């Protein structure tokens, strides 16, 4: 069995502690933001081009005075009314910028939280697919996937805390939760949000979120216990068949809840916008990341001798999935972007306008990281079985898909008030440390080999014919 070393425990706990301290500092700093800070930000943003704008205004006013000399008094009255309206607009803009500044620590934490929870969830879904498809090649890495899904419970609890905080108006992350958005008598009334209030309401949002988390964690709890029981059951595969049935039910519920989750937790950040393939898009970005994490831990455990039956063919198949779903993600990204951009419907293009202006570098950069790098590093069949190629390509993939989630969240919650600093780094450290700790701790508690699985022998003899093995491997890996 694998031994969770003291050094790795210390390392993972250190990451968690660093993350907690940095996140606490970020939340404290965010809570200290005032309307004066918002005014300074607005003033700084107006400095660029202020002189030329001033000159244009002066010229325009001179021309207007010459053309409307006889209506000077009326102009002054209109100007007074305009000043009153302008003051109100300025106050609203300052408040909006203040909310963006206060949102930043929440948003940075939410990006890392959603990414970590999503990866864990998709590892669980990929695990269920192996059960339902009754495949043979992946049996030796089932315990790796089970160990990774140990991260589901803590991230689910944290997500529930963030959701409850949002419902209690402790942040301004979800704009549809603002007061008065569905009250026709309020100055803050929003007809579009009101039209969607049957779905976007705090009670329904909270109930659905709890339901998602309960369904996912219930399956994980059941399948983990039943998988261990499978090793010693000796009951004519009855336990195995129960696990198959449970996995079928879970996958059915997963496909529904994953789409609904993406609408609630991500698309709900832009309540005026919608995309019919958004659930698939979120699925693709999380699935590629999940496969990468599975490959990383499999390579690590194999290097420590904990997975003696895993050979280059298993690694090769994981890399094939990483490559294939990177292409699938690119297809969905291009389909969503191209159709919306060229249809040029204002209600839809507004989503990409902010991302293509204020976030142009990360928006285009993630396409390079999520498509170009996987193509270059993983297209060659030989490279797919080389651990260091997979680590390089996988690291870029994970960074690229973190940026993808960053782009989904930040433009909606902080607008142009974004940069990469302590809040983002702290959140990443916390959830990386949590993933390492929960995975290694879970893997060290049980046998790494699912001895009771009827397809175990097939996995032990799995060999991809196109891979060149060494003489030692060749003697044991062939059928």
What feature does the model see in each segment?
Residues 26-44, 113-231:
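Transmembrane-helix bundle segments that line or gate the permeation/cavity pathway
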Residues 27-105, 186:
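Low-complexity, proline/glycine-enriched hydrophobic segments characteristic of transmembrane helices
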Residues 42, 449-470:
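Short, highly charged, low-complexity non-transmembrane loops/tails of multi-pass membrane proteins
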Residues 120-125, 157-158, 209-220, 284-299, ...:
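Hydrophobic cores of alpha-helical transmembrane segments in multi-pass inner/ER membrane proteins
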Residues 276-282, 347-367, 415-439, 443:
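Membrane-interface transmembrane-helix boundary segments in multi-pass integral membrane proteins
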Residues 388-399:
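Central hydrophobic cores of alpha-helical transmembrane segments
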């Amino acid at each position: 069995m694998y031994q969770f070393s003291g050094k790795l425990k210390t390392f993972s706990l250190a990451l968690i502690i660093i993350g907690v301290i940095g996140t606490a500092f970020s939340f404290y700093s965010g809570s200290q933001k005032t309307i004066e800070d918002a005014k300074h930000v607005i003033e700084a943003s107006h400095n660029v081009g202020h002189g030329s704008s001033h000159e244009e205004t002066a010229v325009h006013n001179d021309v207007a005075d010459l053309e409307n000399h006889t209506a000077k008094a009326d102009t002054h009255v209109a100007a007074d009314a305009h000043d009153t309206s302008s003051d109100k607009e300025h106050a609203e803009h300052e408040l909006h910028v203040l909310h963006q500044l206060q949102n930043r620590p929440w948003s940075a934490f939410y990006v890392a939280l959603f990414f970590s929870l999503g990866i864990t969830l998709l590892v669980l879904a990929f695990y269920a697919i192996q059960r339902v498809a009754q495949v043979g090649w992946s049996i030796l890495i089932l315990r790796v996937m089970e160990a990774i899904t140990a991260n589901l419970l803590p991230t689910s609890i944290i997500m529930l805390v963030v959701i409850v905080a949002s419902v209690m108006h402790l942040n301004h992350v979800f704009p549809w939760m603002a007061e008065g958005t569905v009250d026709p008598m309020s100055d803050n009334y929003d007809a579009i949000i009101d039209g969607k209030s049957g779905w976007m309401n705090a009670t329904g949002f909270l109930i659905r979120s709890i339901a998602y988390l309960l369904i996912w964690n219930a399956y994980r709890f059941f399948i983990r216990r039943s998988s261990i029981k499978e090793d010693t059951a000796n009951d004519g595969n009855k336990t195995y068949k129960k696990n198959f049935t449970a996995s079928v039910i879970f996958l059915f519920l997963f496909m529904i809840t994953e789409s609904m989750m993406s609408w609630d937790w991500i698309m709900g950040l832009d309540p005026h916008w919608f995309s019919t393939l958004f659930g698939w898009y979120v699925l693709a970005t999380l699935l590629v990341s999940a496969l990468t994490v599975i490959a990383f831990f499999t390579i690590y455990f194999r290097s420590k001798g904990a997975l003696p039956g895993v050979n280059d063919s298993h690694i090769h198949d994981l890399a094939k999935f990483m490559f294939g779903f990177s292409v699938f993600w690119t297809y969905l990204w291009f389909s969503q972007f191209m159709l919306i951009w060229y249809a040029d419907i204002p209600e839809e293009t507004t989503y990409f306008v902010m991302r293509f202006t204020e976030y142009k570098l990360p928006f285009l950069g993630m396409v390079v990281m999520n498509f170009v790098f996987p193509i270059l590093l993983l297209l060659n069949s030989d490279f797919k079985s080389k651990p260091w190629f997979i680590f390089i390509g996988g690291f870029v993939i994970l960074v690229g898909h973190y940026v993808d989630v960053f782009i989904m969240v930040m433009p909606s919650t902080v607008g142009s008030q974004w940069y990469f600093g302590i809040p983002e780094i702290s959140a990443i450290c916390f959830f990386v440390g949590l993933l390492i700790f929960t995975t290694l701790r879970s893997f060290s508690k049980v046998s790494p080999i699912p001895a009771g699985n009827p397809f175990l022998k097939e996995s032990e003899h799995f060999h991809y014919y196109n891979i060149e093995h060494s003489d030692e491997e060749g003697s044991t890996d062939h059928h």
